[in-house]
Amino acid sequence: MTHQASPPKKSSLILLLMTMTLLAVFPLDVILPSFPALSGHFRTTPSEIAWSVSIFAVGLAVLLLLIGPLSDMFGRKKLLLAGIALSAIGATGCLFAQDFAWLLAFRVVQAVGCGAFALSQALIQDVFAGRELERIRIWMTTGGGIFISCSPLMGTWLQLWLGWQGSFYVFIVLSGAVWLWSVRLLPESSSNHIPSPRQFFSGYWRLFSDIRFVGYWLISALAFACHFSFIVMSPLIFMEHLNLSAYQFAWAMLLYGAAYVFGGVLASLLHRKIPGDTQIITGLWLIACSGLVMLGLTWQFGVSAVTVLIPMLICTAGTTICRPIANSKAMSLHPTLAGTSTSAGSLLIFMGGGLISLVINMADNHLTSALASSFLLLSAIAFVLNARIRERPHVP
């Protein structure tokens, strides 16, 4: 499924995908400063609220299994529109939830809808190719970093003016805007073919039988898990353990987001100078170094905002350097299965991030040590995967 687009069409598509990226930060990032308010309103602990975010990611990962194959068979546009509408319905339900169980239920509905956002990878694959494709992925990662950097501050303002419901209000409004924009911009693409269960999952069998495909997505997933685990744990570390105010937390995360943007800029520069494999290795080395730095600083000076942020700035630079290239290499292996490839990769990314953050959350009073140890372990696994991939040539 390939659509040739003129430059203005490409520019409009990039803007739409950037807006979708902005929309995607609300369920996981903008809501972070509202952890204390949510725990108070629903009479639960901040750790359980963090646990709910991890469950959101795991549920999203499972549901992504269906999105890709359906998009390859029935078209991206209809599924994207249905997903955006469903995510808005889930967010609306969260506003009217009477207890924590209902909040979780409607968060699952929101997660089902948000699964459609993974189609952005396939939409990029449909329009761009080669070095331009890799460059667009880097831009998307950088754009995501900008939104992530601003999201805690935005969440703090929304919490101040609208309460914990604020992020859901804005999510609903943005969903409506993206839905209307998608109706106008995206071309119709559909199929009347109704697949059998065997046909439906045959694409996954083909993809997961390719060690290079699985390896590149696992590298991206392991790097993402480092970032995601910190995001989920950050309210617990800064607001609960270090007693930072919501605004202090927001400014600390703004600095973290700035590092995310810097990593994207650095990735773009490195992309012009060095091969993709070297860029992946560079990013993984930075993640490993961040784990060592965090262990060293916290052992020498104790846990503080500074001893946590310095290694996290290194880690996020590594994440943004290696992930776009790993994603592009994985997606380029099976271009005729772009939607299924997106779902398979997103499954690994969100499942890994959700499960690893759940494990780290169990550390309770030793969150920084658990984070640092996970950075070392995950980067080591990624190094082994990268070495195995380079030993095996791709067979089309």
Please annotate each region the language model reported:
Residues T2-P7, P187-W217:
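Juxtamembrane intracellular "pre-TM" segments in multi-pass secondary transporters
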Residues F100, F106-G144:
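Cytoplasmic helix-loop-helix junction between adjacent transmembrane helices
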